[in-house]
Amino acid sequence: MFSRWSRWSPVMAGVLCVMASVSVVAAGPTCPPTLAPPTQDEIHAAVRGARDHGALWTIEKDGHESWLYGTIHVGNLAMSMPGPKLVRALAAADALAIEVDVTNPVVAQAIRAPRDSSEGPAVPPALLERLKALAEKACVPWEPFSKLPPMLTVAALTALEARWDGLDPSYGTEFVLAGFAQARKMPIVSLESAGVQRKALSGGPPDRQLAAVERVTAALEQGHMRPAVRALARAWQDGDLVTIADYEQWSGSASSPEAKADVERMVFSRNPDLAAAIDLTHREGKRVFAATGILHMVGDGGLPKLLQKLGYKVQRVSFGGEGDERPDPDPAPG
């Protein structure tokens, strides 16, 4: 079976827009914990204890510098608070560039729009009932999911499952970065359209989509998603690109030709356009802080390598933690 969490994490930026419209039912004894809005004291404590997480690069071309950052789409208050080096980079930037602008109501509406006939097959009744049961287990209403492409539905349910381990989509890095940008009145640039985000999930033959939905549904029912999410969160916190690049291992699943084709379509095939969009914003003279899901950063087709091929001097920023002491599988020397 194909790697579970890695299948969905690259497109979770769109899922964040879906989650913004989902009202969580009041938590009961059988519901996953819900994260209450932090108090001012909790925020101040998180700021004082903030450390840098993820992976950050400087990218330099045409005499000025921008930044490239690998994000995660679930988190908690401590994980989400930018550390000192991230704050300095953000403060020096002229614009924030993310996969899609999760704060833009037009973008959010496009992500949540009902699927059309080209966006995924109809879900068989028995599988539909299982998806509804998963939404009930997550203590969220089914209605926001009912008209979405089925693969976007299981991606959102996967993100909700992480709440059992104290990881919540509302603390996804994109929301935190966007909040920082809004507070500074910094422009937010979408690197790709909502349509591209949806196509990343809803493309592929209908029978393969249904097979994928069935596999992820079964994994959610059996509790197999949580260990993979925890492993990804640990690797992201440590900036451990070696582990992240080996997603087939930490996801606990074997690979297959079909799975590899899906990863190529959902992640790496998008990277050239993402790199071109970052390059365009940088060439406009802006110092851009560009952030995408961290799986976009690994391998020969990762964004650091692609930007280097576009003429950038690309250098990993050391956070001085454990993750920086490990060999980087994607060195992009300047």
Give the positions of each predicted feature:
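Bacterial N-terminal signal peptides that target proteins for export
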Residues: 2-12
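Structured, acidic catalytic/metal-binding patches in enzyme active sites
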Residues: 28-266
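Short hydrophobic "helix-edge" motifs at membrane interfaces and signal-peptide entry regions
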Residues: 13, 60-63, 283-284
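N-terminal signal peptide c-region/cleavage motif recognized by signal peptidases
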Residues: 21-23
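C-terminal soluble interaction/assembly domains
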Residues: 264-334
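Short, well-ordered alpha-helical scaffold segments within catalytic/effector domains
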Residues: 8, 83, 271-275
